[in-house]
């Protein structure tokens, strides 16, 4: 017998993935949310569910304390559905020539530019000589290499870097964010404070440079695109427009989960550039 909160698997529907029991009703039915199929109401006398326990039952989405609240939102488009939509656009997935030309190559080019202009050694030498203006010039050049940061937000960053004090603050905080030795959370928060000080505190600006410098572990946050992808998987993003560590930490957890799921579906993303591009491509209206 299964109960509310149990993790189960449908013996005849393995593609539905792991499910969590939302409710067992008095008339012998169970409402179950399956991670790849959404909510199903099933007569228990017709199915002998496999109960999942122990380490196998651990799941970053289903185990989140706010899962039940998110699971009750009506309508469900599954990750496998989104995968099919992506493959309609790019039949060869992340190796598709169209995908590489339209979505990946220009981001890789921006990463290469950042590593050329603001490598740790080059950045350190510029800081050591007090050449803060050149650091800002290079950072803005990297920002302008892609369309990831909205034009008005690029302008806001540029406008915030007019005084010597703001230019030096930004240069020092950006170096610490990318190459500092302290705990990353603290480096993140001090860079966020810098962006607030110069009135350029936007999530795109906040996450752009680490995303390009370290795409194996850091993610870019474009709010509406990311919120759509998180809602699709019922992930908890804890999104707030103000820059904060909780939202970014949830973003990293979600990005790792999504990457793992794409690997399990044989999509094999190389890094978070592919994962972010996938999120963009499956957002309604982006390729309609």
PLM features: residue spans?
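Basic/aromatic-rich interaction segments and small domains that mediate binding to polyanionic partners
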Residues: 1-53
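Short, flexible loop/turn elements at secondary-structure junctions
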Residues: 12, 211-214, 279
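N-terminal, helix-rich and Lys/Arg-enriched segments in bacterial and organellar proteins
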Residues: 9-11, 19-20, 209, 225-226, ...
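Helix-hairpin-helix
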Residues: 193-210
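An N-terminal alpha-helical hairpin/helix-loop-helix interaction module that forms a charged
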Residues: 29, 56-198, 216-288
């Amino acid at each position: 017998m299964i109960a509310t909160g149990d993790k189960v698997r449908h013996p005849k529907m393995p593609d539905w993935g792991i499910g969590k029991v939302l409710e067992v009703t008095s008339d012998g039915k169970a409402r179950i949310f399956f991670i790849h199929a959404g909510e199903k109401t099933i007569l228990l006398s017709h199915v002998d569910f496999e109960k999942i326990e122990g380490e196998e039952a651990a799941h970053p989405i289903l185990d989140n304390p706010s899962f039940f609240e998110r699971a009750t939102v009506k309508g469900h488009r599954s990750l496998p559905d989104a995968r099919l939509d992506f493959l309609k656009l790019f039949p060869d997935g992340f190796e598709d020539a169209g995908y590489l030309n339209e979505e990946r190559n220009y981001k890789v080019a921006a990463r290469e530019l950042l590593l050329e202009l603001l490598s740790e050694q080059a950045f350190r030498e510029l800081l050591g000589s007090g050449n803060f203006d050149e650091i800002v010039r290079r950072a803005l050049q990297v920002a302008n290499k892609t369309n990831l940061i909205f034009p008005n937000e690029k302008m806001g960053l540029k406008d915030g870097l007019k005084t010597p004090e703001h230019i030096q603050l930004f240069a020092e905080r950006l170096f610490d964010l990318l190459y500092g030795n302290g705990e990353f959370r603290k480096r993140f928060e001090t860079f966020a404070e810098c962006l607030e000080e110069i009135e350029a505190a936007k999530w795109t600006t906040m996450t752009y440079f680490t995303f390009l410098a370290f795409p194996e572990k850091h993610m870019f946050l474009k709010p509406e695109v990311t919120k759509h992808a998180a809602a699709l998987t019922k992930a908890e993003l804890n999104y707030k427009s103000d820059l904060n560590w909780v939202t970014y930490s949830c973003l990293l957890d979600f990005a790792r989960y999504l990457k793992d799921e794409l690997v399990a579906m044989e999509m094999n993303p190389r890094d978070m550039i592919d994962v972010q591009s996938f999120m963009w491509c499956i957002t309604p209206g982006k390729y309609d």
